[in-house]
Regions:
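Short, internal strand/loop/helix patches
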Residues: 400-433, 437
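Non-catalytic, surface beta->alpha helical segment in thiol-disulfide oxidoreductase systems
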Residues: 428-431, 437-457
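Bacterial Sec-dependent N-terminal signal peptides
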Residues: 1-28, 444
């Protein structure tokens, strides 16, 4: 009897010990980066940096991870990032060329098969974009059949992979969603495109059956871009209003979207992210302030994320300050001779067109200055104040040597891009702000419309 009790006790202890070891064993993330673009690589979980490693001159990095939770992570080697799945005890060795990021990315070591498969999923979706685009011209039934056939092939291939590789529930869930979500997003995009000619009204309800497969409240996917992209597309199609219809319906369209989010998503992280996205998208497109007031009132009744609410309110205030007739916001800049000056103290004897650029975006930079010089060839009544958004003054000055000089062009660099981007509501580098000679805002437009845009004196 005593021996039996001892045996039972020993079994319990061993079971507990094995479970403890399994839960507390280390994981490792290391590798080599060829042509590194940054001195650091970061491992993140849900947008929080868990670990950072210095990347040596030879491109080598190493991280030891204690008792890591199984799930979806991502790593950043700026300016790029990619997802990876880590299970407790994995030892992943990465190799990539930072110039050809995703295409060169390969994993070896414990846990590598699932991550190489995940990267292949992403790359295959990218390679299929042209084919998917060609399907958009089809009628609903043939379109769904084509998408379903492609999905069946992917699922069949994944089943074979699962047979040959041991995967836990979390890894399977992540990979299945990585396979399905882009295709389901394509269906939602198809629905949006067909709304305008009423094709959707005649579609059988079975067309939408894929929607039942996606839960909007999966915490593990709360920062997975394909998952969030799909939900955002779903919100577009929950309104009975056509996105391409009259602009005065745009407010109601977005109110329908946030109400759908409020009724369909209970996970606070996912809910706040989707609401934030919709709010930013709406505020940056809407031109009528009274509509923005209405939207903001309804948004704040739904959104409980204090940080997001403060951010959205600040965006609204900055948009209000950029209205026609107001003076351009007070931003501190640095001149070519490295003098600090506030934007409202820059003298101009002519109306000013403010443009923005980065030396990291070569094609945009070339296109921008080509448009400016083309404009000035026929119209010398305006000055261009070109604001660089980078932080390295010396590197900026080196780039200026290669930019054609013109007495109507002045160059500046932002002292604090974060502050400037918020005050200027700089959501893309194609934005232009037109003021009179004293800094009073006349109009806000896009660089692509510069050629046809009439600027009155």
């Amino acid at each position: 009897m005593l021996k039996n009790k001892y045996l039972i006790f020993l079994i319990i202890v061993l079971a507990f010990s094995c479970d403890f070891i399994k839960k507390n064993k280390k994981s490792y993330f290391s590798g080599k980066i060829i042509k590194k673009t940054n001195d650091k690589i970061s491992l993140l979980k849900d947008q929080v940096i868990l670990k950072e490693s210095y990347v040596s001159k030879e491109g080598i990095f190493y991280m030891s991870l204690d008792s890591i939770k199984d799930g979806l992570y991502n790593f950043k080697h700026l300016p790029e990032f990619q997802y990876l799945i880590i299970e407790n005890g994995d030892s992943l060795v990465l190799r990539l060329n930072a110039v050809d990021f995703d295409e060169s990315l390969v994993f070896t070591g414990i846990g590598s098969p699932k991550n190489n498969y995940l990267i292949d999923i992403f790359l295959n979706h990218e390679n299929e974009e042209r084919f998917i685009k060609s399907l958009m011209m089809k009628k609903p039934s043939p379109f769904r059949k084509s998408i379903d056939s492609l999905l069946d092939l992917k699922i069949s291939k994944f089943k074979k992979f699962k047979k040959n590789n041991k995967l836990n529930y979390t890894s399977i869930m992540i990979m299945e969603h990585a396979i399905k979500l882009p295709l389901y997003s394509n269906i939602e995009a198809y629905i949006s495109a067909k709304k305008q000619n009423n094709v959707i009204k005649n579609i059988n309800n079975n067309f939408y059956d894929y929607r039942d497969e996606i839960d909007f409240n999966i915490q593990e996917l709360s920062n997975f871009k394909p998952y969030l992209d799909y939900i955002i597309l779903r919100t577009n199609n929950q309104s009975g209003i056509d996105l391409n219809s009259l602009s005065n319906l745009y407010l109601q369209f977005n109110l329908d979207r946030i109400n759908f989010v409020n009724s369909s998503i209970s996970n606070p992280v996912i809910k706040s992210q989707i609401l934030r996205y919709i709010a930013f998208e709406y505020l940056l497109k809407e031109n009528i302030l009274i509509n923005i007031d209405t939207f903001l009132y309804e948004f704040l009744k739904i959104s409980v994320n204090k940080k997001n609410n403060i951010e959205i309110k600040q965006l609204y205030e900055n948009i209000s300050l950029l209205q026609k007739g107001n003076y351009i916001p007070k931003i501190e800049l640095t001149t070519v001779i490295e003098e600090n000056i506030f934007i409202n103290n820059i003298y101009s004897n002519k109306p000013v067109i403010y443009v923005f650029w980065s030396y990291d975006q070569n094609s945009h930079q070339i296109g921008l200055f080509n448009k400016i010089n083309e404009f000035l060839n026929t119209n010398k009544k305006y000055n261009f104040h070109c604001i660089n958004i980078n932080s390295d003054v010396e590197k900026w000055r080196e780039y200026l040597v290669f930019i054609k000089k013109n007495k109507n062009i002045k160059h500046f660099i932002a002292n604090d891009f974060s502050i400037m981007s918020k005050k200027m509501v700089l959501n893309n580098l194609n934005k232009i702000i037109i003021t009179d000679s004293k800094g009073k805002i006349r109009s806000i437009s896009n660089i692509s419309s510069l050629k046809s845009f009439y600027l009155g004196d």
